[in-house]
Structure formats: structure tokens, C-alpha cells
Amino acid sequence: FFLGFALCWTARAQSPSLNEPGTTPGTPDLLHHSLSIDLDPGRESLVVSDRMRLPQAWLGHNLQFELNSGLSITASNLPISEDPNAQVASGDVIDSTVAQEAEVKRYRISVPASFSGELEISYSGTINDLAEQSSPEYAQSFAQTSGIISGEGVFLSRASVWVPLFDDRLITFDLSARFAPSASDWTTVSQGQPAGLNGWQTEHPQEEIYLIAAEFTHYTESAGRVEASAYLRNP
């Protein structure tokens, strides 16, 4: 199963111009997540602090979002209420890397029209949806799991609902991760540009936020203005 971690790669342009098509510095009309993550693979757990810059159009409205049922909200700077009658079973995920979305809880939050700061939500818990390999072609993929944190590796995507999911709109994000001492040699991989030790960021609109982690060896090679990165899983 975790042979799927053997190779992860990214490619990025070096020193892009902010005037190039597709760049959206500080896009104000998209939800932006700023994630601080503590991972303990041995305990199959994570602790997350998410500071969200909300689109202006959301101010003064009641919002709903979903979060993995294995995670519990521990703090928020706006009142949040869980809808006890709206626990949603796992379902099909469109345009995702896996077939099924994790079971989630649904929450409600009222955002004042005068709200000018960032919505801050902290949460923690475990995610370990073990894959059942129904045929040989799944042996090296994550097609049968919505998300997993374990001593063998971490794979989280939109289907894991590990980040508050409001709707199907595009988002931007930055993240930084720290590991428990037992995984101190691990490395994270996500979209966008590396930002310090185990940090990633992108202002390009995304459909989801990946978080992949294991003990990798990192290789890079440049070809003109493009730098290719390969993350090989250590045996």
C-alpha cells in the first residue's frame, strides 16, 4: 500500500513575474487557509490551527462547513455550533484522487458584517482510513482510502476533509508542519512553493490541499526556468 509514497514530484518556475498569467497574489475573493500543523504519525493524530481570510461576500452571512468526523474543534474566535442532525456519511468525491470522501460532521457559523479579522479555528484528532485493496492495481495507490496518518506515512487530500470544507470554490493556502520526535526526519510535500522547513504556499487557486509526509530523500534538477523536484521514499 505505502509503495505509493515511493515517488512524489513537483515542478515550479524559478522567480516568476507577478504579471504572468495565472498568478493571483493576495487574491481577496478566494478563501485562504493559513495552516499550522503538528503531526504525530505514531499516534495517527494531528493538531491544526487554521487562520482563514474570508471572501468579502461571506461577511454578514451564516456559513456551513464540514470537517472529518475524527477531528474535534477545540477553539474558535467566532461561535461555532455543530448540527447534530447533519452527520454526513462518506460519499463520492468529484475531481479527487480517491473514490470516497471521509465521514464528516457539519458545523454552522455566523460571520458579522463588521468582521474584519481572520476566522481562526483549532482542531485535533485522528485520521486512519485503512485501504482495502480489492485488486492488484490498487497496490501502489491511494484510490481506496480517504486519508491516513500512520507510522508508515501520511496522505491527506480533499477527500479526507482535514481542512474545513465550506463549498466547492477554489482556495489558496499556506501551511507549515512540525513532527513529533519519533518522526523528526520526515518531510512534507504539498502544492505550490516550499516555504521554509516543512512549509508550502501558493496563491494560485487550488481545488484542494494535499499533505503527504514520510521519510523522503529530496532531489532537484533545473531545466531553464523550471526546477523539478523528486521526493523518493527511503526504504
Language-model-detected regions and their locations in the chain:
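Bacterial N-terminal signal peptides
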Residues: 1-8
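Short structured motifs
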Residues: 31-38, 104-110, 157-162
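Intrinsic-disorder/low-complexity, polar/charged segments enriched in Ser/Thr/Lys/Arg/Asp/Glu/Gln
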Residues: 32-34, 45-51, 60-62, 106, ...
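Juxtacatalytic substrate-recognition/specificity segment
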Residues: 50, 200, 217-235
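A surface-exposed beta-strand-loop module
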Residues: 63, 68-141
